[in-house]
Amino acid sequence: MSSLTFLGATGTVTGSKYLLEAGGERLMIDCGLFQGLKELRLRNWSPLPIPPPSIQWLALTHAHLDHTGYIPRLVKDGFKGQVYASPATVDLSKLMLPDSGHLQEENAAYANKKGFSKHDPALPLYTYAEAVKSLESFRAIDESKPLELSSHFTLRCFSAGHILGARMIEVTVRENGSVKRILFSGDLGRFPQLILREPVVPEDGFDYLLLESTYGDRLHPRDDVGARLASIVESTAQRGGTVVIPSFAVGRTQELLYLFRELIEQGRMHSLPIHVDSPMAIDVTDLYRRHEEDYDLQTGALEAQGIKPFSPPDVHFDESVEDSKALNAVHYPIIIISASGMATGGRIVHHLQRCLPDHRNTILFVGFQAAGTRGRLIQAGQPVKMYGQYVNIRARIETLDNLSGHADYGEILGWLHKFQKAPGKTFLVHGEPAAAESLRQKVAQELQWDVSVASYLQKVQL
């Protein structure tokens, strides 16, 4: 009998992995890293409950590491199947997975050097070379038509609006005359969109819906995001400080560049030097320029007019380590956009270590900060450790919730209301417990749907 098993993104927003089984074949949807709390990160080191060589296919909703970052380990442990994703997700993964492997090696080397790992020696989950090798399995999906993997599984993809290349995935599962349709929402984007196409409403008639619940317990502010962003930058500049923005290299950095360009062109903000200090974000921005198929009409019109959407005045793309270090010597107001978005690693950690103790500076969070991450600790004003030492927090801490790449519960419910027929069963995933339970109650009360919160390793007979 066909089945669905939840191998991640239950009780947390990380580690997305879902396993479909039918007719002796296995298809995995997403293959992400667990991040944040130590108890979650330790799952990355535990063997999967099924042997990787027994999985024939993997399909990806989008390129974020909490959905793709375990792939090199899966391949290292014996997966020999094919990985299907949108063209933009394939291109983004070519950047992000090798970078993740490099960071894994870097963190292990640093732990060995400083001796703060309990393991001797500390080893990377996978290496740069292993990440590069895993990319050999990737294949791009043609969104315009279904992809029949076998007599048991057929895939279709739809725009999800979360980041460049993000897709919902519909899987048709056939076994012993039974046909089941399952929709994986992936990470659902906002309504309306700043740059990308909005999430579509696929055809109705799903037997199962797996729905994300990141913001299942809150609404994003509806105030003018540009006005607030400009106000934070201007007030910091008046103090002679630096605005440090931990930003996801994919999606959020490009939205910030788009907004800064608009604000400066409209005279709503003075032009300051903007430094994108993330080789990954720089490469991703180039991909955003190339994959116009994901643009909404407004962004496409800008390109047609010769306007570069992601190039505000006085923007600097700091590729080299020397360029990054040079920012330490700057003593006038600037904006630094750097990865990672939750401050778990990357160049942003050095900028935070330097800028957090100075009251003139502002640390601006522009995305979700998962429990247990350095970003969540800073956001809450709690003691935070960097490179083995606690750092004093004297800088102003601001959060811009409007820029989230995830739909809030109002937007999710609005999307669900467009379904002409309720799914047979809805499972909530990709949310911390309070958020998922809150959304469950709202969906049950407002839509009268059969809905529950999925649990880790739960197996459902389809």
Regions found by a protein language model. Give the residues of each.
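Pre-active-site segment of Zn-dependent metallo-hydrolases
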Residues: 10-12, 22-81, 85-136, 188-199, ...
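Cap/insert and terminal regions of metallo-dependent hydrolase folds
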Residues: 168, 189-277, 362, 367, ...
